[in-house]
From Swiss-Prot:
ATP binds at residues 217-219, 226, 488, 540-543. Keywords: Aminoacyl-tRNA synthetase, ATP-binding, Cytoplasm, Ligase, Nucleotide-binding, Protein biosynthesis. Its main location: cytoplasm. The keyword Chaperone does not apply. Homodimer. PANTHER family: ASPARTATE--TRNA LIGASE, MITOCHONDRIAL, ASPARTYL/LYSYL-TRNA SYNTHETASE. HAMAP family: Asp_tRNA_synth_type1 (MF_00044). Its EC number is 6.1.1.23. This is Aspartate--tRNA(Asp/Asn) ligase. The gene is aspS. It is found in: Cytoplasm. GO terms for cellular component: cytoplasm.
Length: 595
């Protein structure tokens, strides 16, 4: 039986005979004495094979990634050979017995190779997961889950599982559909979230629910998205939005303190959605970056520069300035690169003014657009933005969405650039934030109707219920997102608990009574049986762990992730299925070229 994990061998074991299991990380032959670095999930230990011992012959056969059992005596390392990088670095194990549990073919890569392509890593994921960094990532993920459970258990939350095979309902992204063999022509959907089931649990009287569960969305993938992801899903009854936020702010603070010994600020700052968009162009602003928008829409209405004037007078458009302290030193090539960058977000260009000498007014400014801006506009621009000599001011002028997306992304890019770091434009602190009071609806110009900004079960703010029928664009929601360093790590809301209000929301979304009854009849019925006031939140476990570990991709904190093409390179899923299986499911493929 194993005495302890290999990486846990230390001075406390001196003079003891221990049995260890693990993999050969490295083998070294030093003039007749063989050294093995034995590895397991806890770390490394040095194993020494003396040529006078019978185990030496077996040691000569050992190669990297052989799985072995070792029994030996723990002794101090010779003076001058201690390794402070290892927990076991002061000791070594003099092997008495060794057993090869399984040999290994030559691995396709060295585990300490940091330049592997992601394709190679995901194809050989079993070996990739042996790497110490990946083991640390997944162990940290486990610890986060444990601390979440501890915290919620102490507050009386109950872990209740909800179905994985459920009804397809519109929640913004495409569902993964599962055909029913028994009910021909009918399909289950894999849940995008347990949203409706957790609301049913509140109606059922389970007033505090949580679940760490898989969710599924068939959407285009980015670095921070997976088709299947893990959600910390929570719901509670009889609490208002302030009380709900307090519980889960405390939970995140607890997790960071216990897992990483990080003290997050208390309380988290709070900002309305409107303010966040006005100041940062984003509903998940990265507060590590000190740069902010200055809105100059009103200033630019009567200038001769048509790009600014048109945006300043068009409904739904805006003109903003982004002052970058010390940015006048940016080169033309750097500015061109930023111009190309904002083009990704739909911006048609990137106007700028370098403030060489603020005291000289127009004469101290450098830009092709200065001649098209009158003195009053320039003076107000400098006053509002607080521009000083040596600064640069970038501009966004277009439809509000394009300006917010483009200049908001530029703000973050400059802040975290080498220039931004040298200029002190971004901190390395943890910067949490609550963003509250979101619009209930977004208008889809293509379809000519409103869609739910979060989901259609979010309660309107007090006094906004009448807007559901008179003017949905004015309705704001009791919705809230927890943002950390520019990532939305959790989102939630107070839910609608009255059937008549839920029906009004469906009508605002152009979901007719018949469609609402067909898709959500069970919800509408449940709300009529004394449904309590309730609300909740869901956190992205994958995102939280990605941030804690500093991983470059969310795929580095998931054991067996999918690629950006939603494929598992290890198992080659998704795969074809044979005709018999399709017939049993009453499915026929049409116009599909199998690759």
């Amino acid at each position: 039986m194993r005495t302890c994990y290999t990486g846990e061998v230390c001075r406390d074991h001196l003079g003891q005979t221990v049995t260890l299991y693990g993999w050969v990380n490295r083998r070294r032959d030093h003039g007749g004495v063989i050294f093995i670095d034995l590895r397991d999930r806890a770390g490394l230990a040095q194993i020494v094979f003396d040529p006078d011992n019978a185990a030496f012959a077996t040691a000569e056969r050992l190669r990297n990634e052989f799985c072995i059992r070792v029994t030996g005596l723990v002794r101090p390392r010779p003076e001058g050979t201690a390794n402070p990088e290892l927990a076991s670095g002061e000791v070594e194990v003099l092997c008495k017995e060794v057993e090869i549990l399984n040999a290994s073919i030559t691995p396709p890569f060295q585990l300490d190779d940091d330049n592997l392509s992601e394709t190679t890593r995901l194809t050989h994921r079993v070996l990739d997961l042996r790497r110490p960094q990946m083991q640390r990532n997944l162990m940290l993920r486990y610890r986060v889950s444990i601390e979440v459970r501890k915290f919620l258990d102490q507050l009386g939350f109950i872990d209740i599982e909800t179905p994985m095979l459920t009804k397809s309902t519109p929640e913004g992204a495409r569902d993964y559909l599962v055909p029913s063999r028994v009910n021909a022509g009918h399909f289950f959907a894999l849940p995008q979230s347990p949203q409706l089931f957790k609301q049913m649990l509140m109606v059922s009287g389970f007033d505090r629910y949580y679940q760490i569960t898989k969710c599924f969305r068939d959407e285009d993938l980015r670095a921070d998205r997976q088709p299947e992801f893990t959600q910390i899903d929570c719901e509670t009854s009889f609490l208002n939005e302030v009380e709900i936020r307090q519980i889960f702010e405390d939970m995140i603070r607890h997790v960071f303190k216990t897992v990483q010994n990080v003290e997050l600020p208390a309380p988290f700052p709070q900002m309305t959605w409107t303010e966040a968009m006005q100041r940062y162009g984003s509903d998940k602003p990265d507060l590590r970056v000190s740069l902010e928008f200055t809105d100059v829409t009103d200033v630019m209405r009567d200038v001769d520069f048509k790009v600014f004037a048109a945006a300043a007078t068009a409904p739904g458009s805006r003109v903003v300035a982004l002052r970058v302290p010390g940015g006048a030193e940016l080169s033309r090539s750097e500015i061109d690169a930023y111009t190309q960058f904002v083009g990704i977000y739909g911006a048609k260009g990137l106007a700028y003014i370098k403030v060489n000498d603020a005291s000289k007014g127009r004469e101290g400014l450098q830009s092709p657009i200065v001649k098209n801006l009158h003195d009053a506009a320039l003076a107000e621009l400098l006053k509002r933005s607080g521009a000083q000599s040596g600064d640069i001011i970038f501009f966004g002028a277009d439809r509000a969405k394009i300006v917010n997306d483009a200049i908001g992304a530029l703000r973050v890019k400059i802040g975290h650039s080498e220039f931004g770091k040298k200029a002190g434009l971004a901190s390395s602190d943890w910067k949490p934030l609550w963003v509250v009071d979101f619009p209930m609806f977004e208008y889809d110009e293509e379809d000519g109707r409103y869609t739910a900004a979060h989901h259609p079960f979010t309660s309107p703010k007090d006094g906004h219920e009448d807007f559901l029928e008179s003017d949905p664009s004015k309705a704001f929601a009791k919705a809230y997102d927890m943002v950390l360093n520019g990532w939305e790590i959790g989102g939630g809301s107070v839910r609608i608990h009255r059937e008549e209000v839920q029906s009004k929301v469906f009508r605002a979304l152009k979901i007719g009574a018949e469609e609402a009854r067909e898709k959500f009849g069970f919800l509408l019925d449940a709300l009529q049986y004394g449904a309590p006031p309730h609300g909740g939140i869901a956190f992205g476990l994958d995102r939280i762990v990605t941030m804690m570990t500093g991983a470059e991709s969310i795929r580095d904190v998931i054991a067996f992730p999918k690629t950006q093409r939603a494929q598992c390179l290890l198992t080659q899923a998704p795969s074809e299925v044979d005709e018999k299986q399709l017939r049993e499911l009453h499915i026929r493929l049409r116009n599909v070229e199998v690759k």
